[in-house]
Amino acid sequence: MSTAADLPSTGPGLRLRQPGVEPLVDQDKLPSQPGHSRESSDANADANVSSDKASKTYGRTPDGTVFIVPTTHDMVSQLLDPRQPKNFSDAIVLTILGLHILAAYFLPSSYKRIVFAFVFLFWRACYNIGIGVLLQIQSNHRRLVTWARRWKLFENPATGKNPRPWLYNLLKNELETKIEEDYEFEKAPIEYNTWLVFRRVVDLILMCDFVSYCLFAIVCGHSPEGENPLIGFSRWAIGISLIGFNLWVKLDAHRVVKDFAWYWGDFFYLIDQDLTFDGVFEMAPHPMYSIGYAGYYGISMMAASYEVLFISILAHLAQFAFLVIVENPHIEKTYNPPPPRKRTASESQGDVVPADVKSLEGAFDQQTLAPTHKESPAPVHNLVGLNNIDLFRVPDFTVIVLPSYVAVLTFVTPETPVWQAIFVLHALAWRVWYHLGLGLILDKQSKTKMWTRHFLKFGESAGEAWRQWKGLHHISMIMCNTAFIAACWKMYSPPEDWAYGLVMLKHVLGAGLVALQLWTAFSVYDSLGEFGWFCGDFFFDQQAKLTYKSIYRFLNNPDRFFGTAGVWGAALITWSRSIFLMALVTQILTVFYISYIERPHMQKIYGRSLRREAGLTKFIKRSLPPPVKGWQESVDKVLDDTTQFVEDFLDTARPKFAAGVKTIVRDTSALFNMAPARLTITRIAPDLQGHDPKLYSLSVQGTPSMGTSIDDKFTGKESLTGRFPKQIKTMIYEYGAPLRVKWRAPAGHSKKDWIGLYMVTDNRSRETTEVPSLGRWAPTNAGVYDSLTADVSIAVEEHPVSTTEATEIDMVEGEVEFRGDKLWWTQGVFEFRYHHDGHHTALSISEPFEIRISKFDEEDVDVGAKGLYEQAVESALLPVVQNCLDRDPDIAPNQPEEPFGGHVERDTKYAKRIVYAIREMFGIEFAPPVVAADGSVRKLAWRVSNAKEVLAPYSMSRSRGTTTPAIQDFPAEKA
């Protein structure tokens, strides 16, 4: 079921249609709403009909077909409600469910647990893997609809084109029985009919998944020996409550999203309706997959079985994987595509203060250090995350060395009470410093800009103050967590008997709380970025802005409780008084920091724009009965008065307490070009006989590279006869430029023939291709393969060879174009191979050609004349960047000053292409985030020029620059 709750919206909780999609039905075509005039009863009836028509939901297929979306019912009602019509598929589902129940009753007791564990895991795999694969190929290639069209499932037998009329009649009866209004099987779009068939498969899988889980819980359920009756009653009461809560979540979610999102309808078509996400969608992100699985844990408590608990956790994790891998990418692609590229850059762009922290940092540095260059790009080098570790930076080096020292001491010191006390006190000291020490610094920064003033006093910039603060905060956070983990390690004693008492449960709950804190941290960082993570609005408050997306949609301060969940989880796992004390101190310090440091600053910066209540709070208050609401308002008033008194007291006492306190990678992804060449035994296709490879041919056209490789091949180091170039020259094409392949074959060639692009060194055999194409292929004929991306490569459809080129055998030809992801984004020598009938038998191989990035020629450009040099770099870089961005007008700029499209930030492949090209052209290596941060060819050219200027004194290349050593610098040479 689709859970698209975390989508951008123009209002609270509104789900947007894809930008650029016009309203499906014009307003003048829809019946108007009835007015308030007194008309006859017939007029009122017409108005009611008009209103009913206007309330219909309209859908649109990818080809633009508009249709009325009929009303459907949920699967439980369809299967179990006797008032709902039943059909053959219902009988199949109910029969399979009955077989599950019979198996649970008749199987021997010794086999029940293992059998139903495998049965449930099978249906869970059908759900998360089976449905996941179907939805993935439908989202990327619309393959389910393609299969339905190819198999002619919905083709009327009256046309004579349906090879299986019985299946058509069966589907027609099945679907029309279920949908009584606004639906005609023959007139419905193929996308909608395919979705209805897909729904029946989903019904079977979901019902079997749920029933098999319940049966597994039943066969595993028991009452622990010697259980206290009060504990048993509490266990069942909590379990039933969780099941009831789970049931309410599912029902309320279905009320909001209806069957369209419940059954992933937006993978097939879109509807002309803004879905208001209220109710349960204000409680938690993706409620059907998060809190919607609370019932699993309720059933586990009632069964009193760790087997049920562990299989519930496994199923829940599989559901989250399904969400991340299948649903989220589709939701992002469908409802939140990158914004269109600005066609012209703003003339006043250089005068606008950047809004993000990196731009602010660069802007402050420019004001204090280089005010003459307003267009200087901002630096890009994040701190948080393993992929951002750079040992050339002091903070990163420190957060590797210091935790290593702590780890060594943890392992080599004995487990004595003295050492345990030392480690606990060490962790407590870092905790107090992290919350209280850094908090006091931020408080002074908020009130007097103390931190920034300190660096300005010594001639540094505000940007440098910000960078130093980030380093201090990062080191303190890492050491705080490292010291706490070390203390937990010292205080933890592995249990001798895992089955004793609540030992296992404590470990499971503790691990769950740790996972909750990690998820909270990732969500907070994803929402705030490094600017918010390091409290950037304490340093650059004039450009700070609020965000209420992701986890902040539901909670105002997720760190207040969820941010310390892992500490309490560690206390449960260790079951140590010292760690419990640490958790309590952490909770108090966190609340203190939020209440007396963060909140006053937020109120000062944002004022009335601060949201008073989060989504979860609003939902809970709306759900309270009136008497409870009145009591809650009274309690709120008492709490407000108490809080005001405490704040006044602290304001009075603070000066006394404060007296005497002193304030204090190049990307390493490997390029897996191919699978290793391996010995292949090839079966020649039976229909290959009679196909003469000489009749097949390929010719390649592309954008010739401006550079030449002749100077590299003939350098004077060869013998005299080897210095003369051959008459036949290998074609050299631009890096990333589209390649057009013209193919020619006999008229009787297989429609499943295809053309692949390979490196010349990939294959040892000229008759058989030994390595996969890795997506770099195109069919010769359309409509043969299921892949949506295959047919788009066909530039010219198959057609007979012109009469002027007629031969003894009838020949046909066509053209395919390789661009974007179908190219090799590296330099080398390549070839195209024409393959027979969907196999890897090569009937023709093109002439080898080279893909080459021309080196930037600095001979005619004076590096010292920076303006001219930047213009030359811009001119050389623009066509290369356009190629790297697939020459897509929505992504690639037309002029150096124009910004890149939003896809560059979404997909790192574009940035990786560009930095590779820059490295080969200029010998300068940038990290991929630099491209997205700069956002234009002009800023990239400035960055290249600046890097060249910095590295010029160390360059070994020929140069006419001012840094070339003069002879007077070497007195010994004069003698």
Curated annotation (Swiss-Prot):
<dbReference type="Pfam" id="PF04191">
    <property type="entry name" value="PEMT"/>
</dbReference>
<keyword id="KW-0812">Transmembrane</keyword>
<feature type="transmembrane region" description="Helical">
    <location>
        <begin position="394"/>
        <end position="414"/>
    </location>
</feature>
<comment type="similarity">
    <text>Belongs to the class VI-like SAM-binding methyltransferase superfamily. CHO2 family.</text>
</comment>
<feature type="region of interest" description="Disordered">
    <location>
        <begin position="1"/>
        <end position="58"/>
    </location>
</feature>
<feature type="transmembrane region" description="Helical">
    <location>
        <begin position="502"/>
        <end position="522"/>
    </location>
</feature>
<keyword id="KW-1208">Phospholipid metabolism</keyword>
<dbReference type="GO" id="GO:0004608">
    <property type="term" value="F:phosphatidylethanolamine N-methyltransferase activity"/>
</dbReference>
<feature type="topological domain" description="Lumenal">
    <location>
        <begin position="1"/>
        <end position="87"/>
    </location>
</feature>
<feature type="topological domain" description="Lumenal">
    <location>
        <begin position="135"/>
        <end position="200"/>
    </location>
</feature>
<keyword id="KW-0443">Lipid metabolism</keyword>
<keyword id="KW-0808">Transferase</keyword>
<feature type="topological domain" description="Cytoplasmic">
    <location>
        <begin position="415"/>
        <end position="421"/>
    </location>
</feature>
<keyword id="KW-1133">Transmembrane helix</keyword>
<feature type="transmembrane region" description="Helical">
    <location>
        <begin position="114"/>
        <end position="134"/>
    </location>
</feature>
<feature type="topological domain" description="Lumenal">
    <location>
        <begin position="250"/>
        <end position="278"/>
    </location>
</feature>
<feature type="transmembrane region" description="Helical">
    <location>
        <begin position="88"/>
        <end position="108"/>
    </location>
</feature>
<dbReference type="GO" id="GO:0097038">
    <property type="term" value="C:perinuclear endoplasmic reticulum"/>
</dbReference>
<feature type="topological domain" description="Cytoplasmic">
    <location>
        <begin position="490"/>
        <end position="501"/>
    </location>
</feature>
<keyword id="KW-0489">Methyltransferase</keyword>
<feature type="transmembrane region" description="Helical">
    <location>
        <begin position="306"/>
        <end position="326"/>
    </location>
</feature>
<dbReference type="GO" id="GO:0032541">
    <property type="term" value="C:cortical endoplasmic reticulum"/>
</dbReference>
<feature type="topological domain" description="Cytoplasmic">
    <location>
        <begin position="109"/>
        <end position="113"/>
    </location>
</feature>
<keyword id="KW-0256">Endoplasmic reticulum</keyword>
<feature type="topological domain" description="Lumenal">
    <location>
        <begin position="327"/>
        <end position="393"/>
    </location>
</feature>
<protein>
    <recommendedName>
        <fullName>Phosphatidylethanolamine N-methyltransferase</fullName>
        <ecNumber>2.1.1.17</ecNumber>
    </recommendedName>
</protein>
<feature type="topological domain" description="Cytoplasmic">
    <location>
        <begin position="222"/>
        <end position="228"/>
    </location>
</feature>
<feature type="topological domain" description="Lumenal">
    <location>
        <begin position="523"/>
        <end position="577"/>
    </location>
</feature>
<feature type="transmembrane region" description="Helical">
    <location>
        <begin position="201"/>
        <end position="221"/>
    </location>
</feature>
<keyword id="KW-0444">Lipid biosynthesis</keyword>
<feature type="transmembrane region" description="Helical">
    <location>
        <begin position="279"/>
        <end position="299"/>
    </location>
</feature>
<dbReference type="GO" id="GO:0032259">
    <property type="term" value="P:methylation"/>
</dbReference>
<feature type="transmembrane region" description="Helical">
    <location>
        <begin position="469"/>
        <end position="489"/>
    </location>
</feature>
<comment type="pathway">
    <text>Phospholipid metabolism; phosphatidylcholine biosynthesis.</text>
</comment>
<feature type="topological domain" description="Lumenal">
    <location>
        <begin position="443"/>
        <end position="468"/>
    </location>
</feature>
<dbReference type="InterPro" id="IPR007318">
    <property type="entry name" value="Phopholipid_MeTrfase"/>
</dbReference>
<dbReference type="InterPro" id="IPR016219">
    <property type="entry name" value="Phosphatid-EA_MeTrfase_fun"/>
</dbReference>
<comment type="function">
    <text>Catalyzes the first step of the methylation pathway of phosphatidylcholine biosynthesis, the SAM-dependent methylation of phosphatidylethanolamine (PE) to phosphatidylmonomethylethanolamine (PMME).</text>
</comment>
<feature type="topological domain" description="Cytoplasmic">
    <location>
        <begin position="599"/>
        <end position="975"/>
    </location>
</feature>
<feature type="topological domain" description="Cytoplasmic">
    <location>
        <begin position="300"/>
        <end position="305"/>
    </location>
</feature>
<keyword id="KW-0949">S-adenosyl-L-methionine</keyword>
<dbReference type="GO" id="GO:0006656">
    <property type="term" value="P:phosphatidylcholine biosynthetic process"/>
</dbReference>
